[in-house]
């Protein structure tokens, strides 16, 4: 039985110029059989949402190391809702205080995977979220 691979967009939003970690995650997800699109650095919320919709991804993963999560995620969710994609699974990665992680979960971020999360845990989390949604 053929199964369509899980499609994931990994995005770097804002001025953060560090992408080594997100590239490691991208490789791990690809090695696990997922289709991965990497946005590159310095993307806007609008670019990320547009790409997620155009590429028909199952999961949008936003990596942040710059402390802008409380600004970026409200914009992303507003744009997703406006474009009829409010059901997209959104996860966050990077570095952030526990209180920020809790705040973005309340906005709709399904999982917050910080810098010390092993790649296999990220893979398992994405598979579980997509399976629970019943995608593909």
Curated annotation (Swiss-Prot):
Which NCBIfam families does the entry mention?
A: acid_CoA_mut_C
Q: Quote the protein name from its UniProt record.
A: 2-hydroxyisobutanoyl-CoA mutase small subunit
Detail the relationship between temperature and activity: Optimum temperature is 30 degrees Celsius.
Which amino acids does the record list as binding adenosylcob(III)alamin?
A: 18
Q: What is its EC number?
A: 5.4.99.64
Entry keyword annotation includes Isomerase? yes
SUPFAM superfamilies attached to this UniProt entry: Cobalamin (vitamin B12)-binding domain
Question: Known InterPro entries for this protein?
Answer: Acid_CoA_mut_C, Cobalamin-bd, Cobalamin-bd_sf
Which organism is this entry from? Aquincola tertiaricarbonis
Q: How does it assemble?
A: Homotetramer composed of two large substrate-binding subunits (HcmA) and two small cobalamin-binding subunits (HcmB).
Query: Which catalysed reactions does the entry list for this protein?
Result: 2-hydroxyisobutanoyl-CoA = (3S)-3-hydroxybutanoyl-CoA
Q: How does pH influence this protein's activity?
A: Optimum pH is 6.6.
Q: Please summarize what the entry says happens upon disruption of the gene.
A: Insertion mutant cannot grow on 2-hydroxyisobutyric acid (2-HIBA).
What are this entry's molecular-function GO terms?
cobalamin binding; isomerase activity; metal ion binding
Which cofactor(s) does the record list? adenosylcob(III)alamin
Family per similarity comment: Belongs to the acyl-CoA mutase small subunit family.
